[in-house]
Amino acid sequence: MRLWKSMAWGILLWHSQSGALCPAWPPARAAEEITRLQQQLADWNDIYWKQGVSAVDDSVYDQLSARLVQWQRCVGQDVSSTPVSPPLNGTTMHPVAHTGVRKLADRQAVEQWMRGRSELWVQPKVDGVAVTLVYQNGKLTRAISRGNGLQGEDWTPKIRLIPSIPQTTQGALANAVLQGEIFLQREGHIQQRMGGMNARSKVAGMLMRQDNASALNSLGIFIWAWPDGPANMPERLSQLAKAGFSLTNKYTLAVKDASEVERARQSWLTSALPFVTDGVVIRMAKEPASQHWRPGQGDWLAAWKYPPVAQVAQVSAIQFSVGKSGKITVVASLVPVILDDKRVQRVNIDSVKRWEAWDIAPGDQILVSLAGQGIPRLDEVVWRSRERSKPVPPDSHFNSLTCFYASETCQEQFISRLVWLGSRSALGLDGMGEASWRALHQTHRFKHIFSWLALTSAQIANTPGFAKGKSEQIWRQFNLARRQSFTRWIMAMDIPLTQAALQASGDRSWEQLLMRTEQHWRQLPATGERRAGRVIDWRNNPQIKTLSRWLAAQHIPGFGS
């Protein structure tokens, strides 16, 4: 299918000084779009933390939050007000602040971060809800939600009902502050195959709702920080395990370089785990004293997250493709995103009707994933731009019997027919892709789909963009095509039959084909009444008849008298 480029509308993009890709919006629109997205994130955030209900997938929320920060930086706006943290409803102070964790983009960033740091350990980045546990005189006295890192909600009554969280401790842990992740316990969770399951939202929902004590049995705890704990990591892990926090010991590995981090990351991505993860955290054994911990200032640890299964991508343009059958397909061009090491910059929306139902316009944010064989797939529209500037699709008068001859309105279907006849399903013209057909047609102005047979070697060689070797190859391919079987030439003319049906028919000439009745076609494999009728319509089409006579004049096998 070819792109109807003249009908495509899009938005322009420009690079900011920071290197981010920025929408080329007028100041007023930029301010409006930022405000709208900021408000939407705040609304989702409020519902999430007050009601324990996720109105949007965790990954989508995170990606749109990052998109908002990007837009704010593009226009030089302060990003401190971005609503990516919980609303401050709790007033219980953390005895030790939650620092958060810096995100590293790739292995190169991991190598750079590890350089100059020693005694490093890696842990899975468990996906759940962060909490502070305070033990005094051997008893759990307080449990505080992360909140803004300095203060949060008092979750003590709920946490006391979670069987997996020790209520008493001994030794060095009798008076200790622990930070960790409350997670949804899973049996044999394979992250690569099962994904995130919105685990964070499910945990938050359980902790927010009332009268759900039985549901809390499914929650677990992974301790990832013991402020002012033993400086020796093995000793720290051993004491945590003895106190009942065994997962920390099991899933904390010493690492010396980025290769070891990468191996652990890949192993946890593909192995069965008791929790959902979204990456790994690398941390130094040596940490500053707890009184120096501040939100956003934990430079002794960093995260390397897994790439999301689906990416939020910005639609940059809407384009229309017209295939050889005349079907109009809508394609969304995207600001490129990376999915499973694949650069995705367009996604097929399918028909005009489906596009209209999706209501997608340039500037919208859509969720894209990879379907079978790595084909990009549209999953949902996660954010719509205020401006709804949509292109007008081409007229829908195209069908399987149009555009065998070139015309101004037939350009795209005509090119699609050329690409088809050059494919292995028809004449098998090696090296003839869409770009080559466009170049030949633009230079030599084909009258119909077989006009290329009349080209001389000199004409092909003089086509702009064709090197000597390429033009000679094309000339050889065109000459070889003359020797192809009658069946392949009929396939090139887009007869509405499969090659197997044509072979079963046994026709070896145009004259034989003209003598066949509709009843004959119905009896062929995978050919019923409807398709047989289409064959008759195709055979009687004036353009097809004219092309058959032209091929006869070119002495193509099966078309002569």
Swiss-Prot record:
Gene3D superfamilies associated with the record: 5' to 3' exonuclease, C-terminal subdomain, DNA ligase/mRNA capping enzyme, Helix hairpin bin, Nucleic acid-binding proteins
EC identifiers of the protein: 6.5.1.2
Class in the EC hierarchy, top level: ligase
Keyword line: DNA damage, DNA repair, DNA replication, Ligase, NAD
GO biological process: DNA repair; DNA replication
Highest taxon, organism lineage: Bacteria
Catalysed reactions, as listed in the record: NAD(+) + (deoxyribonucleotide)n-3'-hydroxyl + 5'-phospho-(deoxyribonucleotide)m = (deoxyribonucleotide)n+m + AMP + beta-nicotinamide D-nucleotide
GO molecular-function term, one example from the UniProt record: DNA ligase (NAD+) activity
Active site: K125 (n6-amp-lysine intermediate)
Cross-referenced SMART domains: LIGANc (SM00532)
InterPro entries: DNA_ligase_AS, DNA_ligase_B, DNA_ligase_CS, DNAligase_adenylation, DNAligase_N, NA-bd_OB-fold, NAD_dep_DNA_ligaseB, NAD_DNA_ligase_OB
NCBIfam families per UniProt: PRK08097.1
Family, similarity comment: Belongs to the NAD-dependent DNA ligase family. LigB subfamily.
Role, per record: Catalyzes the formation of phosphodiester linkages between 5'-phosphoryl and 3'-hydroxyl groups in double-stranded DNA using NAD as a coenzyme and as the energy source for the reaction.
Stated name of the protein: DNA ligase B
